[in-house]
Every structure is written in C-alpha cells, then in structure tokens.
Amino acid sequence: MTSDLSSKHCESCEGIGAALNSEQIKNLLPQLNTKWEVTEDNRIIKRAFSFKNFYETMAFVNAIAWIANIENHHPDLEVGYNYCRVHFMTHALNGLTHNDFICAAKIDKLLVD
C-alpha cells in the first residue's frame, strides 16, 4: 500500500461533477489499506477499527474529526467501547469521489498495523 492520496486535499463537492465509476474505484482502492472495502453498489468505502479500550477509541475518533474538519469532508462513524466503523461516501453525489479516498488514506496514516 503506497499512497500519495494522503498528501492531497479534498475539493469542494460543487466542483467535483460526478461520482467515480467502478473502474476508477478499482484503481484507487489498492492505494488504501487492504482492510478498506467497497460496498456492492460502489457507493461507500468502509473499514472497521478495533482498540484496547474506550480511551483509545475516542482518541482515534477525535483524530478523524480533526481530519474531517480540515478537509471539510465527513464520514459516518459507528462507535462503541473498543471499536469504530468508518464509512465514507460523498453524500452530495450519492457515491464515491476522490475526497472519500483522500480522507481514508489520511486515516490509514493514523495507525500502524
């Protein structure tokens, strides 16, 4: 997994135009950690993260919030005591854009597997 996506920044949704097609998604996915999955309808990328305790989970969630704020692109999160599930989709286009992959790559940089 080598990615320069993490060094890029998100574009305004108004300037993107259209969601990515399946070929574009297929080309971008290998640039992320292999634990990221694309839903069958190609509208969402998602990944589950596990932690030792609530404190580590919330520290991770806060780091995601910081990235989301800086990039002005926000994931859907499901958070529990020792887990966080992250889902990215560009809601304005009802599908995936480069923004989703950029933010996923930035999240990948937070943790060492």
Curated annotation (Swiss-Prot):
Protein's UniProt keywords contain Lyase: yes
Pfam families noted in UniProt: Pterin_4a
Single GO MF annotation: 4-alpha-hydroxytetrahydrobiopterin dehydratase activity
A biological process from GO: tetrahydrobiopterin biosynthetic process
Keyword field contains Lyase: yes
CDD domains referenced in this protein's UniProt entry, alphabetically: PCD_DCoH_subfamily_a (cd00913)
Keywords, alphabetical: Lyase
Annotated protein name in UniProt: Putative pterin-4-alpha-carbinolamine dehydratase
Organism whose genome encodes this protein: Legionella pneumophila subsp. pneumophila (strain Philadelphia 1 / ATCC 33152 / DSM 7513)
Organism phylogeny: Bacteria, Pseudomonadati, Pseudomonadota, Gammaproteobacteria, Legionellales
